[in-house]
Amino acid sequence: MNVIETENLTYFYPGASEPALRRVNLQVEKGDFLAIVGNNGCGKSTFCKALNGLIPHFISGSFEGKVTVDGLDTLRTDVGTLAKKAGYVYQDFENQILRPTVLDDASYACLNYAMTDYADRGREALRQCGLEGKERDYIWQLSGGQTHLLALAGALSLQPEVLILDEPIAQLDPLHADRIYEVLRTLNETYQKTIIVIEHHTEYIADYCKHVLLMKDGQVCWKLPVGEALQRVDELQDCNIFPPQVTIAAHRLRKEKGHRGEGGLPVTVEEGKRFFAPLPEPVKMDRPLPAKREETAVEFRDVSLSYRSVKGEPYTVFRNLNLKIKKGEKVAVIGSNGAGKSTLMKLMVGLLKPGKGDILYDGRSISGMDRRTLSKKVSMVYQNPENMFIRDTVAADVAYAMEARGVPGFRERTEELLERFRLTQLSQRDGRLLSGGQKRRASLAIGIALEPEILLLDEPTANLDIATRREIRKTLEDMKDITETVLIATHDMQLVCEWADRIVVLRGGEVIADGSRNEIFGNQKKIQEAGIRPPEIFSMGQALDRDALCYTVEEFLMLFGERKDGNADYRKAVQ
């Protein structure tokens, strides 16, 4: 039985010359767990908004075709009624949290519908989402993962047949991401809910989903069982989707070396153990260490930071933190949600002040610096690029700080930055209306406009497809010609292992590990303690040989390949 059907669905946003959706025909069976994949801008979110009636009832435009959800025609049914059929959790889920306490928020939708059992429905939704016992907590006491689960509980309280989640784990560490997907699995298998996720993380799709829907240019390419879908490596990559790393490695081995393996291509590490079993013993090799840096750019000296909650309870973020960042380093700060990564950055740019201790730039205390001086030392690019846009055009945003400070030649400098970040053709467009990758490039141009010595980036690759990630990766490499020291806070372990020459691991406001990628990921106890997870291909290598330390598909192929000169090839590749 189909719970969702679309017939020739075509939709134009107001004023658009090209459709966001083109003749979409789809059937989704009741009880399915469907992942929707596709490049940024292919129409995934637009399609999902058509399922719960936001399009066309709330977001106007030209709507053609028919959408049926649990027997209701969305064009002839109001959004309030459809919300009880298809619950939606947005990518920016924090905007769905409306009430101060957990139970209050979970039951709020039911209260709006004047349901007499609103509190019971809220409690049941919290129980199903694993938040039992949190009913009286304030929402700001929750972790990022718990807040996401609360948004899900709010949608679930109306007891819809369909639950739609847009990028549910984009801002979460692996432990919180696992918890979200385990809850979704329970809702699907135990409560027979139909789950639809928009997702870039194909390793989670492989572990949890039943079918995959590929979209491109507003059209449906295909809907296939997950095992078959993720084996279409070339097709997925052409659409800027990362298949699981184990699948890419197997595909390349079969294509380049004629390795057959067992059965089809693996999509999980467990399947990979069988496929890669016939491989030869790995070549032993070491990655060259980066040149040792001596000069200190910034130092945290016995820094403590705490605050009191609304209940008057003290909460400590950092206690006697000591940390030095050297000039010229590429540093990745990692750790679970709530570990203190973003707070560390806010302290560095002066948005927060330490309760105790000091932060020094070139040996000079931050407390004695005015904002003009500090902004020349350090700049921060926020996780949400939209927060960087305050003017009507990209060019005006890039020029803003320089113009405000009377920087000589700021117009010429603006043109240089627009050209360097490939923004010249977009200079007169509103930054808020650009694509994901374009927004990131624009926010980076704004961040380095004053030529800071240190650049801080918070989650620079969140929610991005392959093409946009590669774009940002290239931009990060270009940073060495622009700014001296770069520090990123991220959950993206592929980026960490490919880019950083030093990794700092935070847990509960403490530095529990600090070193190279081998020193960090080679210590299983530490990474479990920190709630982080290495790239999937690292786990695949470890499953085949406990001494194997490979962080990219290329390194895996060189490590386990048959080339006699693999050691030389490897060194050439990583330098």
Question: Which positions does each model-derived feature cover?
Answer:
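Conserved ABC ATPase "signature" C-loop
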Residues: 217-218, 508-509
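Conserved ABC transporter NBD signature motif
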Residues: 60-72, 357-365, 374
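Conserved catalytic motifs of ABC-family nucleotide-binding domains
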Residues: 159, 451
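Conserved ABC ATPase "signature" region
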Residues: 117-134, 408-426
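Conserved ABC ATPase signature
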Residues: 138-142, 146, 430-434
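Helix-to-loop junction immediately C-terminal to a conserved catalytic motif
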Residues: 52, 349
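Catalytic Walker B motif of ABC-type/P-loop ATPase nucleotide-binding domains
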Residues: 163-166, 455-458
